Amino acid sequence: MPHLVLDKISIHYDGQPAPAVERVSIDVAGDDFVVLVGRSGCGKTSLLNVAAGLVTPARGSATINGRPITAPGSDRAVVFQNDALFPWLTARENVAFALRLRGVRPAERARRADELLALVKLGDAGDKRIWELSGGMRQRVGLARALAAEPQFLLLDEPLGALDALTRERMQTTLLDLWTASHAGVLMVTHGIEEALVLATRIVVLAPGPGRVVRTFEPGFSRRYAAGEPIRAIKADPAFATARGELTDAIFEGETA
């Protein structure tokens, strides 16, 4: 099974007197959906960037399947809050572009692009240009393009942060469906407490000054969704409210620890 490991990671930025992150360890297996939460400045995105190969840690090691992570690679796909799509292309052409980079033959690109768009529930939007799509639809295209690389791990940096509440909830189901269908491990950053509880197999709570792990949770709600339980029913469960309170307390307690 694929395995991504951040081991005792410390990150220093030039001009900063203190480390941004100090001795943080996180592991993500191929069937994990790991979510990083915590207030701004605790190093969530910095750690994601180490996993992506965009930041080199001052100390510690980052590996994927035992190999050092030194640069971006096709075994990882990154989706940010602000999409990096080509607005002059259609949704299908954006996904097909990623397939072209993989060397997929022209005759197969459109078919495969349509399959990926259908997977993110955009099967009828292939001919629409990106500027015609809503924020939620654009994020779906971004996810489809990321999956075109057939990565072992999806790295998601607040991909739902700019969406309205209803679209955000719909996208949560999309992310869970993709996680189940793609068999890719996920490492995600979010500020949303409910979002973390719904999506994660494991939640890592970080605190600032410098960034460090203060607690981990294994809420189990994503497994319930995978077994067929609707998200609305999960959120209505008193156990979900209890978990939300515990996670909120852990974040606040981490700020004062």
From Swiss-Prot:
Its job: Part of the ABC transporter complex TauABC involved in taurine import. Responsible for energy coupling to the transport system.
Taking the record's annotation, the residue ranges forming a coiled coil are none
Q: Does the keyword Transport apply?
A: yes
Protein name in the entry: Taurine import ATP-binding protein TauB
Q: Where do the annotations place ATP binding?
A: 38-45
Q: Does the keyword Translocase apply?
A: yes
Q: What is its main location?
A: membrane
Q: Which InterPro entries match?
A: AAA+_ATPase (IPR003593), ABC_transporter-like_ATP-bd (IPR003439), ABC_transporter-like_CS (IPR017871), ABC_transporter_ATP-bind (IPR050166), P-loop_NTPase (IPR027417)
Subcellular location(s): the record lists: Cell inner membrane
Quote the catalytic activity from the record.
Answer: taurine(out) + ATP + H2O = taurine(in) + ADP + phosphate + H(+)
Q: What's in the keyword line of the UniProt record?
A: ATP-binding, Cell inner membrane, Cell membrane, Membrane, Nucleotide-binding, Translocase, Transport
